[in-house]
Regions:
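Structural signature of the two symmetry-related core transmembrane helices
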Residues: 85, 116-132, 333-352
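Symmetry-related core transmembrane helices of the 12-TM Major Facilitator Superfamily/SLC fold
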Residues: 181-183, 211-232, 339-348, 443-463
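Conserved MFS/SLC helix-loop-helix module at the cytosolic interface between two early adjacent transmembrane helices
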Residues: 100-142
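Glycine-rich segments within core transmembrane alpha-helices of 12-TM secondary carriers
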Residues: 91, 97-99, 151-158, 173-210, ...
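Intracellular juxtamembrane helix-capping segments at the cytosolic ends
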Residues: 72-76, 131-132, 155-171, 197, ...
């Protein structure tokens, strides 16, 4: 084998040493970070344009018109179609192709850059709306399957680039708040989508599919994605409020070096510990979508797309602030974060099992909030708990991984692996729920069993979380405040 170049070897060594995650690693003093004095002296929009806050807002806008619209369609149950099976198959293809890209997402994002990776993803946003429109109105099902596969390939770029930015752009002390803001903006798109769904479909009290015109409005929103992506600043030009830059060490690594570094990340203990939690974190999407489609009316499903994100937005903002509270150590906050979603989700699985026993597996139930509000609320509440606390699951995993983050390049690799695990779970979930002959209680049972496997992984992972944030970061903040 040829000898590694200096940049390759140093990058690989960094991965092998920095990420062993000794709880006291972050207590070691590091070199004083480079502060951009010109940025601190600047004022007005030019300063704001390069700020972390503006980058988070832009990522929120991209998510608003991209993944958020996809969620609004998915939250209808079965993509808003009359049965869930075609939409679940399309979503399966979306996440299978996405998992292939995210697996190598770290090297790809490191070579292309966060900004242009996001731009590539935004170009495929309109394909989703057009696919559902043609399927709902003209029955062109093959097109839906093709475009969701293409969208999955490009969405993989956004999954890795946005998550990498969320973990490395903000200062450690503000990361939870920015994660909450980003998640809230994603759900704001789902709120808009939910309002559109409900206004168009609120008169439809029976089972079936939503009005095809719904998808045209979504398509129009998706067409704006590339604008927000082009406004992003390159990572090297992003500045935190104290004038520091995101750590860009390990630059100019060759493709061979990137793949070697990715392999080093894949062998780390934290990568394997996060596999099951990441696989589980989005698994509920297919399971809950099928539950909603089988047992609720079109009006109830449209209402759900509005209720779920409206509840989620304040929840993720509060959750983000909780993750940033300095009165507790990072590890204590990680324990609190775990309990906040594990307990309600475990209870919801039991509740959903009882509801399936009452409702059976037919598609003729059509529970409706107007015709029978009490029975609708009783069956809908566990669904709502699963979806809203599901965002807490994802935020807590992002935040925990952020405590291990060192530089943008290495974080992109670990994030790529994390999102590959996540999309793999989503693909399996929607794949199980795309089989019309399979009892829908089987995917629910698989989902419930996964939470039992999540617990030991999360317990071990949290024990590796550093007790304190970097001391230099603490001293730097004090100097800036002074």
């Amino acid at each position: 084998m040829a000898a590694a170049t200096p940049s390759d070897s140093s990058d690989t060594i960094e991965l092998a040493t920095t990420h062993q995650h000794n709880p006291h690693d972050h207590d070691d003093h590091k070199a004083e970070p480079d502060v951009d004095r010109a940025y601190l002296a600047s004022k007005g929009f030019p300063k704001f344009f390069r700020s972390v806050l503006f980058q988070i807002i832009l990522f929120g806008c991209i998510s608003f018109v991209g993944p958020s619209i996809f969620d609004a369609i998915s939250n209808l149950g079965g993509g808003g179609l009359s049965t869930p099976y075609l939409a679940n198959l399309a979503t399966t293809l979306n996440y299978v192709s996405g998992s292939l890209v995210t697996l190598f997402g770290g090297p790809l994002i490191n070579k292309i850059g966060i900004k242009w990776s996001s731009f590539i993803a935004s170009l495929a946003f309109p394909l989703v709306g057009s696919g559902y429109y043609l399927s709902a109105r003209y029955g062109v099902d093959w097109y839906l399957l093709v475009v969701t596969t293409i969208n999955g390939l490009t969405a993989g770029f956004l999954y890795v680039s946005s998550t990498t930015a969320m973990q490395t752009y903000p200062d450690q002390r503000d990361r939870g708040w920015y994660l909450g803001m980003w998640s809230a903006m994603m759900n704001s798109g789902a709120v808009v989508g939910g309002i559109i769904n409900f206004v168009i479909n609120y008169r439809r009290s029976g089972a079936g599919g939503v009005a095809w015109f719904t998808y045209l409005i979504f398509l129009g929103l998706e067409c704006t994605g590339f604008i927000w992506a082009l406004l992003l600043s390159p990572t090297a030009r992003v500045r935190r409020k104290d004038g520091t830059r995101p750590d860009l060490s390990g630059r100019n690594v060759t493709w061979k070096g990137e793949l070697e570094a990715l392999w080093a990340h894949a062998r780390q203990k934290t990568s394997w510990l996060v596999f099951v939690p990441a696989f589980y974190s989005f698994f509920y999407g297919g399971t809950m979508g099928t539950y909603l489609t089988l047992h609720f009316s079109v009006r109830a499903r449209a209402l759900s797309t509005m209720i779920t994100p409206m509840c989620t937005i304040p929840m993720v903002m509060v959750y983000g602030k909780l993750l940033d509270m300095q009165r507790w150590s990072q590890r204590t906050r990680a324990w609190m974060a775990l309990c906040s979603w594990v307990l309600p989700q475990a209870a919801s699985f039991v509740w959903l099992g009882v509801e399936y026993h009452k409702l059976g597996t037919s598609t003729s139930t059509g529970l409706d909030p107007v015709l029978d509000s009490r029975r609708w609320a009783e069956a809908y509440l566990p669904f709502l708990i699963m979806f809203t606390t599901g965002y807490w699951t994802q935020l807590s995993l992002y935040w925990i991984l952020g405590t291990f983050a060192s530089d943008v390049k290495s974080t992109a690799r670990s994030t790529g692996l994390f999102r590959a695990f996540t999309t793999c779970g989503m693909a399996v979930s929607y794949g199980l729920n795309s089989d019309a002959s399979l009892d829908p209680r089987v995917p629910l049972s698989v989902n419930a069993a996964l939470i039992a496997l999540v617990l030991p992984c999360m317990i071990t992972l949290i024990r590796l979380v550093p007790e304190k944030i970097d001391i230099q970061s603490e001293e730097r903040l004090e100097k800036t405040s002074a």
